[in-house]
């Protein structure tokens, strides 16, 4: 490995030349003060050192340390053995570009974590070289989380993500990327963020495709964006718990006191004020179902999907399927659906929520599980599909089995299990019950 320096519109930046790619870590795309909106970085002095490990925004592990939680499944699965560095407003991104090539399509990934945790460097997706091998520039975005993002439904984290995408659009050509061929991808809360970003006109013409893993669409009563007035009572309680007389006093408290107050109050509430983006007038200008009804959300090709052991998989599938059916009904851009049902080897947790990340990013050698040839082959196929989609808006190509979008003729989702090549429409009985319950509210 050696160093590699290139010139961007912001200035020179130094990365690491690896076997199959060039890696740039921790590039700051924006600056922000606490509870203020991000300002895009347009210039830096000297040579930006992107050879060092990236910083991540404040979260649970910053203050309480996950290794002390003996029953934390996702720590054991995704983060054990890695050290993460934290900063309150670590608005940074990582870029993995091919060794050669210009005008490469660009994949921007937004990590999950319930809007309260998560990093760009987690084992399944951190700095994967698989897309660079296929001629795709891969970008992973860090953004503000929990109270530092969601305070009073102002969506600081979503604005971070939008700013990161605009920074990529303005600068990715210097990294060999094509700014006119950007696809955004997210998992879980990251997929919900992608959903929210499709509602804003600010990214129209910039984002050409979207991929949503286990989080496409929202239900009004379960994940509906709140207005600032609706969430006022919750945030007033958080400030009171912190001993702050008003918003200004709350803002001036040490970060850990702010986070602890939010964490304690949020665990006492069954509603979702503490974990959901809100109606901000810009990214989410109004209720999403109103935007969808007006047809002003971005009409671009989509990939949506679920795992068979997702959290409430029948509901998540129904939401994703409802999105696809709406596009078919209204003659919008195609939606390619998938159903991940590979039983991961190693323990009783099989196709769990986020298990598909190992396959979509190919970092299997960093996992403790005894993956088999079937798993590596399935992963290569899934990555090929995504690389094709990022390149053209269609996952098909080469010798890959045909992946049909949802249509009047094809009512199923492409099954990924390493065995079959068919389509699935699972959980039909439970989905019908949910569909009846949601009939007047509807997947959006």
Language-model-derived ranges and their functions:
Residues 154-173, 230-233:
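Alpha/beta-hydrolase active-site loop
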Residues 321, 325-444:
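Mobile gating loops/cap/lid regions near enzyme active sites that modulate substrate access
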Residues 1-155, 271, 371-382, 392-400, ...:
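Non-catalytic accessory segments of hydrolases
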Residues 204, 213-326:
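Substrate-access "cap/lid" subdomains that shape
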Residues 112-113, 156, 160, 188-191:
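Active-site loop->helix "elbow" adjoining a glycine-rich segment at hydrolase catalytic centers
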Residues 143-146, 216, 341:
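Short beta-to-alpha linker loops that shape the active-site pocket of alpha/beta-hydrolase fold enzymes
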Residues 191-203:
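Short glycine-enriched nucleophile-adjacent loop
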């Amino acid at each position: 490995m050696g160093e590699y320096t290139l010139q961007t519109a912001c200035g020179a930046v130094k990365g690491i030349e690896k076997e199959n790619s060039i890696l740039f870590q921790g590039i700051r795309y924006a600056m922000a003060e606490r509870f203020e909106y991000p300002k895009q970085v347009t210039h830096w002095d000297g040579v930006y050192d992107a050879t060092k490990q990236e910083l991540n925004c404040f979260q649970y592990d910053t203050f309480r340390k996950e290794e002390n939680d003996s029953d934390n499944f996702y720590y054991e699965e995704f983060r054990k053995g890695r050290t993460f560095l934290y900063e309150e407003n670590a608005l940074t991104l990582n870029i993995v570009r091919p060794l050669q090539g210009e005008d490469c399509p660009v994949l921007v990934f937004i990590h999950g974590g319930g809007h309260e945790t998560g990093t760009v460097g987690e084992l399944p997706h951190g700095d994967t070289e698989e897309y660079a091998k296929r001629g795709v520039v891969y970008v992973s975005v860090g953004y503000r989380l929990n109270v530092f993002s969601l305070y009073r439904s102002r969506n600081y984290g979503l604005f971070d993500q939008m700013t990161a995408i605009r920074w990529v659009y303005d600068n990715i050509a210097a990294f060999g990327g094509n700014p006119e061929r950007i696809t955004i991808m997210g998992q879980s809360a990251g997929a919900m963020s992608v959903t929210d970003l499709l509602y804003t006109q600010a990214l129209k013409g910039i984002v050409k495709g979207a991929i949503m893993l286990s989080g496409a669409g929202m239900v009004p009563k379960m994940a509906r964006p709140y207005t600032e007035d609706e969430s006022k009572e919750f945030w007033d309680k958080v400030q009171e718990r912190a001993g702050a007389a008003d918003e200004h006093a709350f803002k001036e408290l040490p970060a850990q006191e702010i986070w602890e107050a939010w964490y304690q109050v949020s665990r006492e509430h069954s509603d979702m004020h503490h974990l959901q983006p809100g109606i901000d007038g810009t990214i989410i200008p109004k209720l999403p179902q109103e935007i969808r009804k007006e047809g002003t959300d971005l009409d671009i090709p989509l990939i949506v999907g679920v795992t068979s052991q997702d959290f409430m998989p029948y509901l998540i599938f129904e939401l994703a399927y409802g999105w696809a059916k709406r596009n078919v009904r209204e003659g919008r851009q195609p939606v390619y659906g998938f159903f991940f049902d590979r039983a991961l080897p190693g323990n009783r947790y099989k196709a769990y929520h986020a298990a598909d990340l190992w396959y979509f990013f190919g970092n299997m050698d960093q996992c403790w599980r005894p993956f088999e040839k079937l798993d590596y082959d399935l992963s290569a196929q899934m990555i090929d599909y995504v690389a094709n989609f990022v390149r053209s808006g269609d996952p098909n190509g080469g010798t890959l089995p045909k992946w049909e979008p949802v249509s009047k003729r094809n009512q199923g989702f492409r099954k990924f299990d390493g065995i079959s090549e068919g389509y699935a429409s699972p959980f039909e009985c439970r989905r019908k019950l949910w569909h009846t319950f949601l009939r007047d509210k509807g997947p959006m």
